[in-house]
């Protein structure tokens, strides 16, 4: 069973142990970078499968202030990561599907969720689409990975 939780102190060491394939770091950053990025507007979360931390992501409640394509009242999904040993098991798609009811229960003030995904990362693109995201076909060319 997949669950989503806000990051707590007890999760930190578990998040630090999450490994990414070298080619994925350019898209989402490292666990260390993730742990340094929490703020009042960037909420850090963990992904659990059967109560084991297998990944993490950020919810950016100020996303619309920084990205023109994101309408007021939206929230941003950023740095979505699954441990490299947990990939290919359906956990990414399952987490994306679980995200929508989680947002409704915990972020109901936000009307929609947006993200950017690099075209050089087709596995992530497919995961988001299968999980329920819609492709707007708009291109955002400001990402660090090109």
Predicted segments, located by residue:
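Extreme N-terminal starter segment of soluble prokaryotic enzymes
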Residues: 1-3
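Short coil/turn segments at alpha/beta junctions that flank glycine-rich nucleotide-binding fingerprints
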Residues: 89, 106-110
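Conserved acetyl-CoA-binding loop-helix of GNAT-fold acetyltransferases
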Residues: 82, 88-102, 126, 130
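Alpha-helix N-capping/helix-start residues
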Residues: 9-12, 93, 119-122
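Acetyl-CoA-dependent GNAT
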Residues: 6-79, 83-85, 102-106
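C-terminal "cap" of GNAT-fold acetyltransferases
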Residues: 74-75, 109-125, 129-146
